[in-house]
Amino acid sequence: MSDERFQVFDSLQRHNTRLRDSTRLGNGVGLASWYNEQDLIDLENADHHTLSLYIADGYQSYFKSTDGWHNGGGPDRLCLMPRQYASTWNIRGPLSFVHLYFT
């Protein structure tokens, strides 16, 4: 994604996540398609919102909450990560997903 930087996008590129495609839509909006199958990802207080949609697989994707790890992944599942939100994800199997980044 050219000019505009999205912190979640940049963070995923420093992990095992593989970027399949991305585009900047303008006006503070970006879209990216990703694949991952084994990773532990900490996302820290981004200055934008992220809407995540699982496209395929994701059955072994775990989210860490205050009371432990929770599995909620699978095709057609949505997750909203609002601006300034911190989260930890443990990806233990194949996962194809898209992110919509917006300010």
PLM feature spans:
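N-terminal regulatory/effector-sensing and dimerization cores
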Residues: 10-11, 17-103
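Charged, compositionally biased non-catalytic regions
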Residues: 1-10
